[in-house]
Swiss-Prot record:
The lineage of its organism: Eukaryota, Metazoa, Chordata, Craniata, Vertebrata. Residues 154-188, 492-541 are annotated as: Disordered. It comes from the Eukaryota. This is Kinesin light chain 2. It comes from Mus musculus. Residues 154-163 have a biased composition (Basic and acidic residues). Kinesin is a microtubule-associated force-producing protein that plays a role in organelle transport. The light chain functions in coupling of cargo to the heavy chain or in the modulation of its ATPase activity. Through binding with PLEKHM2 and ARL8B, recruits kinesin-1 to lysosomes and hence direct lysosomes movement toward microtubule plus ends. PROSITE patterns: KINESIN_LIGHT, TPR, TPR_REGION. Residues 78-143 form a coiled coil. Residues 532-541 have a biased composition (Low complexity).
Amino acid sequence: MATMVLPREEKLSQDEIVLGTKAVIQGLETLRGEHRALLAPLASHEAGEAEPGSQERCLLLRRSLEAIELGLGEAQVILALSSHLGAVESEKQKLRAQVRRLVQENQWLREELAGTQQKLQRSEQAVAQLEEEKQHLLFMSQIRKLDEMLPQEEKGDVPKDSLDDLFPNEDEQSPAPSPGGGDVAAQHGGYEIPARLRTLHNLVIQYASQGRYEVAVPLCKQALEDLEKTSGHDHPDVATMLNILALVYRDQNKYKDAAHLLNDALAIREKTLGKDHPAVAATLNNLAVLYGKRGKYKEAEPLCKRALEIREKVLGKFHPDVAKQLSNLALLCQNQGKAEEVEYYYRRALEIYATRLGPDDPNVAKTKNNLASCYLKQGKYQDAETLYKEILTRAHEKEFGSVNGENKPIWMHAEEREESKDKRRDRRPMEYGSWYKACKVDSPTVNTTLRTLGALYRPEGKLEAAHTLEDCASRSRKQGLDPASQTKVVELLKDGSGRGHRRGSRDVAGPQSESDLEESGPAAEWSGDGSGSLRRSGSFGKLRDALRRSSEMLVRKLQGGGPQEPNSRMKRASSLNFLNKSVEEPVQPGGRVFLTAAL
């Protein structure tokens, strides 16, 4: 059986196929012309007398011509298909080039997006920082508005540092030392502040209260140098002296120097007394207050929380000092916009004050006022109004007795005047009557409460009630000495417990006393008229004279009763000799006085 051998198939390119097809078309067209030429005579003979076999030839030619036409048509189709494939390939190349460009553009867009995201992140951080600064500026603006409410002569005489009110020193918040404070200190490490350091602290306060920092600072530095020579740097007395010097620096607005000293004191006390000692908590609180004055609320908050933990552990969760620390922590959170935490801390502080100190303690009204301010910022106006009314009612009961039909607090009179204003058709003002005596309640907290409650009445349309409260607040301001100043004068001149005073540019100039000197003994005693109050003058000149006389009395007491005017250029050694006489200790060889730590 024979086997067919097929020719080997070769792959032709598209161009070769096109060229071959064109050659075939030319051959078919030539062949078609020849067939037509042969077919024409045969067709004419077919119409006449046909020759034998002409019909068969004519039929074959026509069939061949049809096949040729079919071949030409297919060849044209192949050429058209080739042209279409070429166009498709060209379009494909264009699309590929476009894809490459899109890939490059996509990569560029990704890089642009990454850069934009980084810019957005930096912008969000900047916005958060600006928002925090905005909140701080808003709070400072509110403080300034409160300052503008003061009488003009007060603003001229006593420039007010709002941060001193925002972060009051611990000794200012508590009118008396915590009961059993010395026992607590003895139980936790056995360290008690020596009487000589307490006396030195009081003397430094007297000098600084007169703005005589050129005497107070060298006095502190000399005492610190002597303590380091006798006891070494890592001694609790050195830490106490560092605290005193830091508070003097803080009053001079030298915050960086004060922070450095407080951190050094903190390290010493943690090393010598332990991390859970009350003195460590006091130093932490002072450091937090310092950061708060500089606007570093985030850095201050963990320090304040740690001080709170120590005091809760040492004193218990219901001690007044714990409430004091809670109030400081609430102030820090308030400046960071943490409204819920502020409310929680103030509620705890209020519960402690009311339980341990009684409802008539000034700290109760002050904490209620702060809590009401927190409610205002949260939009809880009804809760804030309730607290303000409680403050006014309690102040009225404390001053004038229980509330009854005729003895009503000022806010009740204000609302009665609001209700009866439409009945007074002649529009004559009401007689002051019994509510006028409520203006005699001269407390700074009550005065602030009157103004704030009046501001709450105005959006409610209670203009008459608002005017009544504001009028009462103004009358309270005009009576004698300003309430805030009167309170500080009484604490300074009558308390005799070594409390700290405000900075030199305020009502009572000088550094705030160190928080950890809560167990300190009596300081300078005031032997004035015994009333504990001063009459108001056109300026604070009399107050400064009183402070100067108090300083002279302290120096005479330290000298043993001899009259001597403290000199602004007094040498450090002389000041230390006063201290030496006050505690009746012998002078060390060489005539130099050394402050020793008595445990």
